[in-house]
Amino acid sequence: MKNNYISTCIVYLMAALLLISVISIKECTADISDYGDPCSDDLKDYCIHGDCFFLKELNQPACRCYTGYYGSRCEHIDHN
């Protein structure tokens, strides 16, 4: 009985890890306009490796990073 329980747990764990892997490789396809308006010209270089948009509700700029980059201003490269 104990071995059966362990086998069942392993199967569920493997399925969960596979699901996480599939979800993590899916690329975001949302339009930047879904997040806010494009940044003004004075903020055009705010995002180092990404697109800048302005969040009206927070009254601040934000970035949508290009694939392979992350950080609040897309300043870090993902080496994985």
From Swiss-Prot:
Main location as per UniProt: secreted
More about this protein: Is the major venom component.
Name this polypeptide is given: OMEGA-myrmeciitoxin(02)-Mg1a
Record flagged with keyword Signal: yes
Entry GO CC: extracellular space
Statement: the UniProt record of this protein carries the keyword Secreted: yes
Distribution of this protein across tissues and organs: Expressed by the venom gland.
Superkingdom, natural source: Eukaryota
